[in-house]
Each structure stands twice: as C-alpha cells, then as structure tokens.
Amino acid sequence: MFKHKLTNLIAAAAVAITATFSLSHARADELATLKDSGELRVAMSGQYPPFSFTNDQNQVVGFDASIGEAIAERLGVKAKIITTPFDGIIAGLLAKKYDAVVASMTITPEREKAVDFVGPYYHAGRAIVVKADSSIQKLEDLNGKIVGVTLGDAHEKWAKAQGNLTVRSYKGLPEMLVDLDAGRINALVMDSVPVMVAVKETGQKIRILDTPNIEGGRVALGIAIRKNNPELKAKMQKVLEDMLADGAYEKISMKWIGSDIR
C-alpha cells in the first residue's frame, strides 16, 4: 500500500513538474520564436508623420519606426516594418500578422483587455486644432461643427461621445490638414505633437484651443503585444528602459520631434 501511494505521489509530482515546465515553455515560446526567426514584425499606420510615414525612397520612417528598429536591434533581431490601417491594427496583432504595434497607440482600459502594453514610450496631449483665423475660440464653440479624427484612435471615440459634433474619420494627418485648410472640416482632434511638427514643415497657419480641463489632456502611449507573453513583455520593457537611460531614446526623439517627448 505504501509503495503504491509512493508511486502515485511520484507520478503526480512528475505531472506537476511537466505541467510547470510546459507552461513556462509556452510562455517563453513567443520570445523564443521571435529570436529563432531573427525578425521582429512591427506594425504602424505609415500615415502619421513624423511618427510613421513613407519617405522619397519609399521607406517607412519616423519616430515610431526608429523606436521599433532600435528595440529589434537590442533584442538581437531585425525589424520588419508593416503598414496597416490603424482601425484594424489590434485585430491584425491578435491574428499574428505581426509581433508588436508601435503606432502611437494610447493606453486605454478597453485596449488593455485585448493586449498588453510595453511602456509608456511617450506622452502626448489631446489637442483641438483650428485654422489660425477661425472664429472658434473654446470647446463649446465646436457645437454642431465638423471635426476630423484618425480612424480607430482614442480621439475618434472621444469626439463621437460628445454627441454634438459631426465626426469625419481619416486614415492620417496629412488628409486632415488639407481638409482643415480647405474648410471642409472646422477642426481636428488628435495628439498635439504630430500636428505641431507637421505644420512647422508645411507653414500652415493653425491654432490649438486652450482646453485645460479636456479629457485626455495628457495621455500615455504604449507598444502593444499579445497577452500571455510575460518574458517578451519584460524583455521589451527592459530594452525600452535602457534606451531611456542611455540616451538612445532622446537621440531618436530629437531627430524626429525636436524635443524629448518621454
């Protein structure tokens, strides 16, 4: 009887050890697979200068692209930049079309239910942008007006929730700025940083409304990865923190933005 019980205990322990090992191995799978492939597939819209856009050589470049490439290099792999519409970018991640989303994505409770975030890797503020000569002076003046937003981003959700705005969604900032200048929209809602950088290059005259109490006045943006990958998340977080500490992040930020936006 004792021998039988001992045998059962040994068998149970073996099963437990095997299960623990299998779980640990499964959790490490994505990081291990990534390293085995030698490639980190990084998704972004490619329509969001200066964070991601296509240059004259048909290469996707910008702050997000450079951050993705730097993280990949420190992981010991090469970055493969994949462009995809922002409104379907999380679905593509969950479908394993790429490994990470470096696309200026605001960290929200709703998104955290679907993905894990590395970061924040920068902070930004919600801006209401109008033409310099617009009669719109405050948030309340937008009542009944047409506002432009990026399809699928947090600002689109905010604008639609106001209930008093006509919301027009776009694939990216360049189209919005063209329509703002032409009067096809009265304002646009998005992160302040890319707007200021874009108009500095184009010379377009705009004004940002003073909205100190607006929801989302300062938001954190993160790098999205699939859930249940603790090793990958920890490794990428460590890489990002090292970049923030050793000057690599600041160098990238100064190149594309002109300031440190951490």
Report residues per predicted region.
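Sec/Tat signal peptide C-region and signal peptidase I cleavage site
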Residues: 21-28
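Extracytoplasmic small-molecule ligand-binding "clamshell" domains
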Residues: 29-104
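Alpha-to-beta junction loops
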Residues: 40-41, 76-78, 95-103, 146, ...
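Ligand-binding cleft/hinge of the Venus flytrap
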Residues: 52-56, 68-77, 139, 152-171, ...
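Short helix-initiation/N-cap motifs at beta->coil->alpha
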Residues: 65, 81-91, 134, 153, ...
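Extended ligand-binding regions for polar small-molecule ligands
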Residues: 66-74, 146, 151-153, 218-259
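Periplasmic-binding protein-like
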Residues: 123-130, 192, 196, 200-241, ...
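Flexible hinge/capping segments at coil-to-helix
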Residues: 130-147
